[in-house]
Amino acid sequence: MPTTVWLVSHAANAALRAGTFPRAPVAGDDADEALDARSIEALAAWRERWSARLLRGERDGEAPRALTSPAAIARASAHATGFAAAASCNALADTVFGAWQGKRLADLAREAPEALEAWTRDPSFRPPGGGESFDDVRARVGAWLDAMPEAGPDLIAFTHSSVMRAAILHALGAPSASFRAIEIAPLRVAALRRAQHGWVWLAARD
């Protein structure tokens, strides 16, 4: 059977709800990416709705292989939904935000409004300080997808909205500027299936 990849956006937490860019990982300090009561409740509801199906898989009961972004919030989301053995995968990592890491959107809107506007509209824009553009993310995600065999085990991948946008646009062969037209909320699922000509975006059944 063709490979199917189930992409899951990680849970929201206090930092995400406050509109704060993720900080650079610091050994032993994942406070900004910790789950809170609201995210734990949302994850429990997601697990009730989705995990039995995904743990069972769609190949006569064969469970998919689980992967996760290296980010603590993605790993915690995988663990809380029954995929504790998910392996870390760098291709699923969040966008690198450079000097914007740890900053609030509201503060950037005051301090650097033109740069923030460019980031929301231009897929080639890189945040200062070594940040990644959407085009950069799309290139790494597209390379990861295209390296997969046409037939292989299904995958479930806990990742970030930017990675999911990149994967969907890669599957569709759509221009990167279309990233503005895709909204992905926390704990949403997108499915991609391998095909002879590339990838097909499947409507995930909730």
Regions found by a protein language model. Give the residues of each.
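Short amphipathic alpha-helical/adjacent loop interface patches that line ligand
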Residues: 39, 43, 47, 112, ...
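Phosphate-handling substructures
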Residues: 81-140
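Generic beta-sheet signal
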Residues: 4-5, 64, 151-162
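Acidic, low-complexity terminal tails and accessory targeting/binding regions
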Residues: 1-5, 46, 57, 88, ...
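A short, acidic, amphipathic alpha-helical segment used as a generic capping/interface helix at domain edges
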Residues: 140-149
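Conserved histidine-centered catalytic loops in small-molecule metabolism enzymes
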Residues: 54-91, 117-118, 170, 193-206
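A structural signal for the main folded, soluble domain(s) of proteins
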Residues: 126, 133-134, 152, 187, ...
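Active-site-proximal alpha-helix that buttresses catalytic centers in soluble enzyme cores
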Residues: 2-83
